[in-house]
Amino acid sequence: MTTVRTRIAPSPTGDPHVGTAYIALFNYCFAKQHGGEFILRIEDTDQLRSTRESEQQIFDALRWLGIEWNEGPDVGGPHGPYRQSERGDIYAKYAKELVDAGHAFYCFCTAEELEQMRAEQQARGETPRYDGRALLLSAEEVQRRLDAGEPHVIRMKVPSEGICVVPDMLRGDVEIPWDRMDMQVLMKNDGLPTYFLANVVDDHLMGITHVLRGEEWLPSAPKLIKLYEYFGWEQPKLCYMPLLRNPDKSKLSKRKNPTSVTFYERMGFMPEAMLNYLGRMGWSMPDEREKFSLAEMVEHFDLSRISLGGPIFDIEKLSWLNGQWLRELPVEEFATRLQKWAFNSDYMMKIAPHVQGRVETFSQVAPLGGFFFEGALKLDAKLFESKKLSADQVRQVIQLILWKLESLRQWEKERITGCIQAVVEALELKLRDAMPLMFAAITGQASSVSVLDAMEILGPDLTRYRLRQALDLLGGVSKKENKEWEKLLASIA
């Protein structure tokens, strides 16, 4: 009997997302419920954004939650390497096979040619897509251009008509017209694969039997199915999971909700409660109980109990569930966990240099730096009153800084300062006009330790969370303001 093998394949391009943890949990439970294996693979072909620091954060976040893997970059295994950036020769080999078999072709179109092509298609009211012009090149012309070293990509051929039937374990057969599919790029001009080729090749070579992924990938499933057909490989069973939603039913995003697993760890949530809550996202226990462990979820896991309605990720409900777990801890374990969360040496060493020179007794540390150990702050609206800025300008400054910080790939003091500086310059203000607002939002105080150091220590999600808190306190942002300020944001370097 074939061993069930599932996987999670996150990209190390930022903080570990709760959506990644959610999909990882369901893949893990499905594999373990069937006595199978769960694999961790790293999709790091985006060389500009991928970092080893983000990769380590993924490892740490999943392990904090209690999700372990049988094979992966850090534990090894018989199907490695498990980083896509280390599998380039493998992808090149299989891409060449597709070209030789007539299922893919070389495309030498420049970015300017492609942009002009799309513009002309849009002007005609057509859906922009690659028009197949490289297919008209003769074999001799293709070889000449390859020999000359011209930049190129490899694209797959797709049918221009007909229906592709996608067998989904949740929805049954889903019919998707082929005329919605583009001639997908498989290998980029830097020699790295795109998601489609890398996933099909890796899933096959790693013996993946079942793929549980987010439903945002369902519309492009025909491309994956066609690649399996071209290679002559057996296709894994496919399951497209419902996406997590904000309370307003929009797709979960860091603009409306903290999305980093690290944020919830820093906020003092228990990993058991976090897993429990993610397990309730569209799934339920047979007896409908709300509180259950990972082991209990594995024991009773059944895909038929997944609801297709978009599950709502609500911090208030997560907090309620966390309280259930917290209050049931033996008091000794409660004390141990509290000490580990608040007073662990790594975190204290980040904070100590910033408070030591400002206190005369240890009892003064809490009033000065207590905000380091809090989640949501009790903010005072009076702290946001400015002699120079109007109430609308105060909200504008905070909102623009919040948006600007969302674009940061590396969370460092110098880059944080740069974001704030860019906003105040665009608004023709001084740094001293914005910093009191940052102190009020981030520390809940008029003055404290360096707020820029505090933002770096607290991390991106908790910092942004507190800025959103401040905006809510001050009345939020109207749709009209949101539209106007986003235009202004686009002009800020």
Curated annotation (Swiss-Prot):
Pfam families given in the database record: Anticodon_2, tRNA-synt_1c
Catalytic activity line of the entry: tRNA(Glu) + L-glutamate + ATP = L-glutamyl-tRNA(Glu) + AMP + diphosphate
Keyword Cytoplasm: yes
EC top class, as a word: ligase
Gene Ontology CC: cytosol
Keyword annotations from UniProtKB, A to Z: Aminoacyl-tRNA synthetase, ATP-binding, Cytoplasm, Ligase, Nucleotide-binding, Protein biosynthesis
Main location: cytoplasm
Record localization: Cytoplasm
Binding site for ATP: K254
GO terms, molecular function: ATP binding; glutamate-tRNA ligase activity; tRNA binding; zinc ion binding
Gene3D superfamilies named in the record: 1.10.10.350, HUPs
Motif segment ('KMSKS' region): 251-255
Domain of life: Bacteria
EC number: 6.1.1.17
Motif ('HIGH' region): 10-20
GO BP terms in the entry: glutamyl-tRNA aminoacylation
Oligomeric and partner information: Monomer.
HAMAP family (alphabetical): Glu_tRNA_synth_type1 (MF_00022)
Family: Belongs to the class-I aminoacyl-tRNA synthetase family. Glutamate--tRNA ligase type 1 subfamily.
Function: Catalyzes the attachment of glutamate to tRNA(Glu) in a two-step reaction: glutamate is first activated by ATP to form Glu-AMP and then transferred to the acceptor end of tRNA(Glu).
Protein name in UniProt: Glutamate--tRNA ligase
